[in-house]
Amino acid sequence: MPDGREGAMSGGGAEARRHSGRTGAGETKPLQAGAGLLFLREEEIRLAQDLLFFAYRDFTNVADLILEELGLGRAHHRALHFIGRNPGITVTDLLGILRITKQSLARVLSVLVERGYVAQSPGTDDRRQRLLTLTETGQALERRLFERQRERLTAAYREAGAAAVEGFRRVTRGIMDDEARAYVDGAERGAPPNPHPRGA
């Protein structure tokens, strides 16, 4: 019995080439946005879930090996990353980015502060605020973790090419909610973090 792919590719070789992006001369061209919408089929979406899962697993695993040596976990890594990206970030803003409970973040920060990776200082305008920065030791650890993950990401970028990298960014951005997009927009401009752009 014909399956969904056979039905979608029916209508002659020209139609098949239009959906696949092939020109008929052995060359390929980028698919137009929405061309055939074959990528919206259920199996394609499930495959995308597989891709996201395995990519995240293997991307984080290269850093996990270092973290395990130090008795740390991914929650500590995420905190190190965003504190390093935003020196002087408040605990409130970090909570807005990570979306974990205050108790969970308190446990994470307690370990990082006790081990000398993170320093806390009171806010200049509001002394009740706690501003977070990485110490030299914390910067060194964050850099070590970054270099491991950069190797994996750089290799993937080089293999895929510039057009695919741009497509990857557009897809991942499309998955994010408005607050995450606002943060990324600010990071691209070099602006301070704003995890609650709508006053949430």
Report each predicted region and the residues it spans.
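N-terminal leader segment of winged-helix/HTH proteins
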Residues: 1-70, 200
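Hydrophobic/aromatic-rich alpha-helical bundle segments in the mid-to-C-terminal region
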Residues: 38-42, 66, 153-163, 183-193
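Charged, amphipathic alpha-helical coiled-coil/dimerization segments
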Residues: 6, 10, 14-25, 60, ...
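Flexible interhelical turns and helix-capping residues at alpha-helix boundaries
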Residues: 45, 56, 87, 98, ...
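DNA-binding alpha-helical recognition surfaces that contact promoter or target DNA
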Residues: 107
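N-terminal helix-turn-helix DNA-binding core of bacterial DNA-binding proteins
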Residues: 57, 61-104, 115
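Exposed, interaction-prone assembly regions rather than primary DNA-binding/catalytic cores
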Residues: 166-200
